[in-house]
Design a protein with these regions (language model features):
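Glycine-rich cofactor phosphate-binding loops and adjacent beta1-alpha1 units
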Residues: 163-168, 207-287
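Mid-domain Rossmann-like dinucleotide-binding core that forms the NAD(H)/NADP(H) cofactor-binding site
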Residues: 138-222, 226-227
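Rossmann-fold dehydrogenase core element
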Residues: 262-264, 274-314
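NAD(P)H dinucleotide-binding glycine-rich loop of Rossmann-like/cofactor-binding domains
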Residues: 55, 92-175
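C-terminal hydrophobic helical "lid"/dimerization subdomain
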Residues: 32, 251-255, 294-344
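Residues in the short beta-alpha loop(s) of Rossmann-like NAD(P)-binding domains
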Residues: 202, 269, 292
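Local beta-strand N-terminus motif with an aromatic residue
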Residues: 83, 123, 169, 214, ...
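Glycine-rich beta-strand-centered segment in the early N-terminal region that forms part
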Residues: 21-36, 50-98, 132, 137-140
Length: 344
């Protein structure tokens, strides 16, 4: 089969012929990839930022946002059958450890992360687990929802954490209206009554945010802090949901949050630099967000089937992966990049 593999950090990916994955365990599921989402994490992987944390050996196949059709199943799989359309939760959890029992799939003590620490979905086929596949509504196609497996899952996971502080009359600032942010806006609109303020340097992204139901669009041109202060009566927002986490976003977010506010960190790339006395005196809470749970993904698919969440995408054939990554890195993508294998 074909797979786009990383052979050396900072190099372009290569389209290789590799052996097909095989069923080895009773809960294994092999998915024929219909679409794979392109994530900024894939750029960070290419740059070597995940090398030490993942411990993966090169060459390997990235790709952690995947959807397609069940190709083959292990002997104990009962929740899906060959031919079913599925979206793949990006993490394979054991289901038996303490975090799994608590519903914290992403912190499984025995888990693995296809596309991060083992071969992922930039390929014709992907091996995953019965615990990771969500059967899709018949009206949903892989190319339309693949990136929800991480981008959407991460967005809804953060929004669900913020629900308790986003009651009527509250305000939330969304930093970044791109691949993750535009999904987060829709989740906020569907799940909370909060007033949504979106900050982004791109007028196209802000126009999309307006279409998706955001209340205020603020151009990140140097005046954003002053404008957000005016929109929040000088007090700041109850919550910041930061889908950028670099290029000055953290500093902006800290300036836009009200006392006793909650800062949800999703994007990454720079450090959180704030004096501890400010954290204490202002009672600001910083909350990290790593993807989401299986149940989060199931709920997101329900919202999608109801038409409350729509993924805006640009598609590329798998063999054009380096063009797609260049477009992502250059800020030319609106919404999410989607790779389509020739076998889809």
């Amino acid at each position: 089969m074909k797979a786009a593999r990383l052979h050396a950090y900072h190099d372009a990916l290569r389209l290789d012929d590799v052996p097909e994955p095989r069923i080895e365990g009773p809960l294994d599921v092999i998915v024929r990839i219909g679409a794979a989402g392109l994530c900024r994490t894939d750029l960070h992987i290419q740059e070597g930022q995940w090398a030490e944390k993942s411990g993966v050996a090169l060459p390997y196949t990235p790709g952690h946002e995947n959807a397609g059709w069940v190709h083959e199943v292990g002997s104990a799989v009962s929740n899906v059958q060959v031919g079913d359309t599925v979206i793949v939760h990006p993490f394979i959890s054991c289901g038996l450890c303490g975090p799994c029992r608590q519903g914290n799939d992403m912190h499984c003590l025995n888990g693995s992360f296809p596309g991060i620490d083992r071969d992922g979905g930039f390929a014709d086929l992907l091996k995953t687990s019965a615990r990771s596949v969500v059967k899709l509504d018949t009206g949903l196609a892989p190319k339309d929802i693949a990136a929800l497996a991480d981008a959407g899952l991460t967005a809804i996971h953060a929004v669900k954490k913020a629900i308790p502080v986003l009651g009527p009359g509250t305000r939330v600032v969304v930093i970044g209206a791109g691949g993750l942010g535009h999904i987060g806006i829709q989740c906020l609109r569907a799940l909370t009554p909060a007033e949504i303020i979106v900050v982004d340097p791109s007028e196209r992204a802000l126009a999309l945010a307006a279409e998706l139901g955001a209340d205020h669009m603020v151009t990140a041109d140097g005046s954003q802090r002053e404008i957000v202060a005016d929109l929040t009566d000088g007090h700041g927002a109850e919550a910041i949901i930061d889908f950028v986490g670099e290029r000055g976003a953290i500093e902006d977010g800290i300036a836009m949050i009200r006392n006793a506010g909650f800062y949800y960190v999703i994007g990454y790339g720079e450090n959180i630099d704030i004096p501890t006395i400010d954290v204490i005196s202002r009672e600001i809470s910083f909350i990290g967000n790593l993807v989401g749970t299986y149940n989060d993904l199931h709920e997101l698919m329900t919202l999608t089937a109801q038409g409350k969440v729509t993924l805006h995408t640009t598609t590329y054939p798998l063999e054009a992966i380096n063009d797609a990554m260049a477009d992502l890195n250059g800020g030319r993508l609106q919404g999410r990049g989607i790779l389509i294998p020739a076998t889809a």
